Swiss-Prot record:
One of its GO terms (cellular component) is cytoskeleton. Gene3D superfamilies: Tetratricopeptide repeat domain. This is Outer dynein arm-docking complex subunit 4. Keywords: Cell projection, Cytoplasm, Cytoskeleton, Repeat, TPR repeat. It holds the Pfam family TPR_8. Residues 161-185, 487-531 are annotated as: Disordered. The keyword Cytoplasm applies.
């Protein structure tokens, strides 16, 4: 008994030992054991901020972003400007699908530690996630005087839609109809796929007032269960497909479906299997099952590689398409380098067999990978190669806008302005208000950096008009702030020019007086010499 007491009283290890053990386990990818070691260390020193961040990283790897967020916030309570805590909080928020709030913290950290590459990459990936997660590009990226701020918002319909999914629809919801257009519902349907019918079923249950008042046998309210189910589907649809807009994925899938349409009635032809497999691969990716999508695409690719061109026509084109699917899945899994190689394989096949549509797709994806990891020069080079292959005004306005953004990141402002103007022209041709808004903002940003304040004010005013047409209150408020900053910049520029003019006049007057004085001295000396 005494021996047991002695064992209980004796400390098992020191704080440093637990920390070292946790770090070793983390590097071995044994995240649960590493978390336990960090927990033991925190029992000895509960307010050790680096240990909190280390455990937060483990929770993130274990798929527990809420716990990761809790530890990150605890480290920030100890030190408000602890950059590791800020980064970890941003990463946790990103994993939870709260991209906009994650973006705020990436920017806070970048302002504190601009040399830390993680913040820069975080800004890039959060920005892209906000732009593409609901399927249509409706982001706004603004900059004010004090700090670079990306104010990216989806349509107002997104927020209205989320509220509508957890509350009973009211008959007089006229305002909601304005901000929840039919195309947004189509986007959600495409993102959820087969799960969309489940979502509709849950929403119908929510309208049954008698049902939602009941409880399960375990005492849990049915209302809460239904709400949680709907919220889960909302969260997943928000997070899925961050890298590529739905319209682009639809295009790729339709291309392949059209190629095989004439053969779909032949039961012995493998084209039926291929079309069905492509749909399943895309559906898995859209459902957030990137790893399953990847495995399915790999399986189909192996089968296709065993076939000959006699077995199946357009074999090479299909092979490239599967490499593209694999690359998209790898991007979602965070395997950036592997994704890049897969898309390059797609490009190589397209170039070898002169498949222009496939080449355009591959260049599109390669550019996205480069932009995501901050290699803006490489992204520009790839996307500029894609320009001749862009067929529609909508595709061109997106392409010019992305190239312009890359130039803006590289501080090559004149080029950013040039592509902003091109994007604006194509957006006008496409009559797409959302892209007109994006192009106007990009153009205004470039003009502010060039100190062309009058032009910037005009561009911001055009952007403001389009934000109001879209009923995008967030973008409207952000543009108003940027507009005031541009006006203030113009006033300061005018004051500076006026002061410079006055100084020039004073210098000119001083030079004249000095010349006259020197002339008088010269005359006086001449008279003295003559005397």
């Amino acid at each position: 008994m005494a021996e047991e007491t002695d064992e209980q009283q004796a400390p098992q290890s020191t704080f440093s030992t637990y920390m070292a053990e946790g770090e070793q386990l983390y590097h071995k990818a044994e995240y649960k054991k590493a978390s336990d070691s960090f927990t033991a260390a925190l029992q000895l020193q509960p307010e050790e901020k680096n240990c909190l961040v280390a455990r937060s990283k483990c929770f993130l790897k274990l798929g527990e972003p809420e716990c990761a967020l809790k530890d990150a916030e605890a480290s920030l309570q100890i030190e408000n400007d602890f950059f590791k805590g800020l980064y970890q909080k941003a990463e946790a928020l990103y994993a939870m699908g709260d991209f906009e709030f994650a973006l705020v913290h990436y920017h806070r950290g970048y302002k504190l530690r601009p040399e830390f590459q993680g913040f820069r990459l975080g800004i890039q990936k959060a920005q892209e996630a906000i732009e593409n997660s609901v399927g249509t590009p409706a982001s706004v990226k603004l900059e004010n005087k004090t700090d670079l701020q990306f104010i990216s918002r989806q349509e107002e319909s997104k927020k209205a839609k989320q509220k509508a999914q957890v509350k009973v629809q009211k008959k007089d919801s006229k305002q909601q109809k304005k901000v929840d257009p039919e195309r947004s519902q189509k986007t959600v349907r495409q993102l959820l796929g087969e799960l969309y019918s489940d979502k509709e079923y849950l929403e119908s249950l929510l309208r049954d007032e008698a049902l939602v008042k009941g409880n399960t046998r375990g005492g849990v309210k049915l209302h809460d269960l239904i709400i949680n189910g709907i919220l889960y589907l909302d969260t997943r649809s928000e997070f899925w497909r961050q890298q590529k807009p739905i319209y682009a994925r639809q295009r790729d899938r339709k291309i392949m479906q059209q190629k095989w349409k004439r053969d779909k009635n032949k039961s012995a032809d493998p084209s039926q299997y291929i079309v069905k497999s492509l749909e399943e691969i895309d559906q898995l990716l859209s459902s957030g099952k990137a790893e399953e999508s990847y495995k399915k695409a790999q399986l189909v690719l192996k089968k296709v590689e065993r076939w000959t061109s006699v077995d199946i026509h357009n074999r090479e084109e299909l092979t490239g398409s599967l490499h593209s699917c694999i690359g998209n899945a790898q991007m979602d899994m965070g395997q950036i380098e592997a994704a890049l190689q897969s898309h390059k394989k797609d490009l190589a096949i397209a170039e070898k067999y002169k498949l222009l549509e496939a080449k355009s797709r591959a260049l599109d994806n390669i550019g996205r990978v480069y932009a995501r990891i901050g290699k803006f020069n490489e992204a520009i080079k790839v996307w500029e190669e894609k320009i001749p292959l862009a067929n529609s005004s909508l595709e061109k306005t997106w392409l010019y806008h992305e190239i312009g953004r890359c130039y803006l990141e590289l501080e090559q402002t004149a080029e950013a302005k040039e592509y902003g103007e091109k994007s604006q022209q194509e957006a006008d041709a496409a009559e797409d208000i959302e892209w007109q808004l994006n192009a106007c903002v990009l153009l205004a940003q470039a003009e502010v950096k060039l100190k062309h304040y009058q032009s910037a004010i005009s561009s911001f005013e055009n952007a403001l008009e389009r934000a109001r047409l879209l009923h995008n209150k967030d973008a409207e408020q952000a543009i108003l702030v940027a507009l005031e900053d541009a006006k203030q910049g113009m006033e300061e520029q005018q004051e500076s020019e006026q002061n410079n003019d006055e100084n020039d006049n004073l210098r000119a007057d001083g030079n004249t007086a000095r010349d006259e004085e020197e002339e008088d001295v010269h005359v006086q000396r001449t008279e003295e010499d003559e005397g």
